[in-house]
Amino acid sequence: MSDPLRIGLLGASRIAELAITEASRETGDVRAAVAARDPERARAYAAEHGYEGIRDGYEELIADDTLDLIYIGLPNGLHAEWTVRALDAGRSVLVEKPFASNLLEFDAVASRLESSRGWAWEAFHYADHPAVHRLIEVVRSGEIGELRGIDVHMDMPAPPASDPRWSFDLAGGAMMDLGCYALNGLLLLGEALGEPVELISAEADPYEGDGRVDATVRARLRLGEAPVAMHASMAGPGWDFGLRVTGSLGETYLPNFVKPQEDGRLIVRSTSGVGAEERVERTGGASSYAYQLRRVRDAVRADQRSAALLGRSRRTMALLDAVYAESGMPRRPGRLG
């Protein structure tokens, strides 16, 4: 096992509790420092979650050479700006999804990787969990036959109006917060099958508080020759993070592909033979965030720079821009050129 990382949090955020605080308790990595706009908030956060101390502002955190990894869990619109600043300081970064606000901004960040001593990974934690790996194995094995269709949902009840996920200037919207998971998951499956993912059409329901922000998006795509239905909503009646892959001989389904630790079932249904058969596999309750942190730690310690993962992140960002254009919604504004 590689040596534990000393991790600094850029932002005392809710998502950091899952991605770093709880995950590091499983992995043994060190919760070293927190920086927030309000030092008192950082101090309270550090005390509550067992961090060694705080830094007086974001700049001081990214300048700290004792840190091995900076985690950026700020609002979407700040991801690219602070990833660039951390890379320019020679830090390695785990940045929450989405990597940037739009494709131009993504490329501005990626260009910094060529000269930085550090690297940047986008926090699509679901892709590290064995449940997702097992779904891909079932599809590739031919057990459900030829690929016939995919249905993926990323739906949740509406957050309060004050939530930054509703802010256009902070790159909010259903696709940025939720739909990016669906697009990234489709690309991951497409890579495993050697098939491209193509957007066919998209339509959006705007948020009532700001018509520039998408509350719900419905999109049709194609993975190879198979049709894909995608639904992403921050105004749903409940939670639905399901991924269903249908073939000529059956289907396989993850009820919660984004957080399999909350529902680790992989359901495989066969329609061949006499009657339908169903098998439920249990993929374990370990956190996808812990799997992600172990992978990033190994990459940091081995100085591994994955062009493949960066490429998938870029294709995800390109699809996000394309969905907005196709649905008639404005592209999220960026802070970089």
Model-predicted segments: where are they?
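Predominantly a Rossmann-like dinucleotide-binding segment in NAD(P)-dependent oxidoreductases
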Residues: 126-200, 205-209
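C-terminal helix-rich "cap/oligomerization" subdomain common to oxidoreductases
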Residues: 1-4, 9, 29, 69-71, ...
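Conserved SAM-binding strand-loop segment of SAM-dependent methyltransferases
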Residues: 51-58
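Contiguous beta-strand/loop segments that form the cofactor/metal-binding neighborhood of enzyme cores
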Residues: 184-260, 294-304, 337
